[in-house]
């Protein structure tokens, strides 16, 4: 691939780069993000345990992402499953006041271990996206909290980002109502 001056979109933000990056979009079957990076000329791949629904199986690696994290990537964007870590699931973690559901806790710790594979990956640029986690999970401190309404979508959903080697996102189109 030839090197071209491109505009790199990092989750909606514009960064000018003069490189073609090797990009892994983990836990993404829709290919919405990978298509944006491909359109900018990057060597981008989605990976998920599900088949892709975005129409480009040639850009999709169906299977476990773990071995891929040992490869060289310039950027990893990960959307790990949040089912057992999210604060919204606290009612299931504590079915009775003061009592933790052991099965749910074990699944939460498995989910944390999977999350940490991305967080600790040997890659210069990493973004991990997830909703607000329960404190009991013990995830590393987030880098930033964003809301869809800060970027032109009329929704409220507190989203946490863990960033490595990337700038914080700046709101681009704040909706007030």
What are these regions (language model features)?
Residues 2-4:
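Extreme N-terminal basic, low-complexity initiation segments
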Residues 7-177:
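Conserved active-site and SAM-binding loop architecture
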């Amino acid at each position: 691939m030839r090197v071209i001056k491109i505009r790199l979109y990092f989750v909606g933000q514009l960064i000018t780069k003069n490189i073609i990056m090797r990009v892994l979009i983990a836990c993404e079957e829709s290919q919405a993000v990978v298509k944006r990076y491909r359109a900018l000329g990057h060597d981008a791949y989605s990976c998920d345990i599900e088949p892709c629904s975005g129409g480009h199986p040639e850009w999709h690696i169906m299977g476990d992402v773990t071995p891929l994290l040992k490869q060289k990537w310039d950027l990893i964007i990960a959307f790990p499953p949040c089912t057992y870590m999210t604060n919204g699931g606290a009612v299931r973690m504590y079915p009775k006041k003061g009592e933790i559901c052991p099965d749910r806790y074990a699944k939460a710790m498995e989910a944390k271990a999977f999350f940490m594979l991305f967080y600790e990956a040997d890659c210069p640029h990493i973004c991990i996206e997830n909703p607000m986690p329960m404190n009991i999970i013990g995830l590393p401190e987030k880098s930033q909290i964003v809301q869809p309404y800060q970027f032109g979508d009329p929704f409220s959903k507190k989203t946490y980002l863990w960033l490595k080697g990337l700038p914080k996102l700046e709101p681009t189109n704040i909706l007030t109502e």
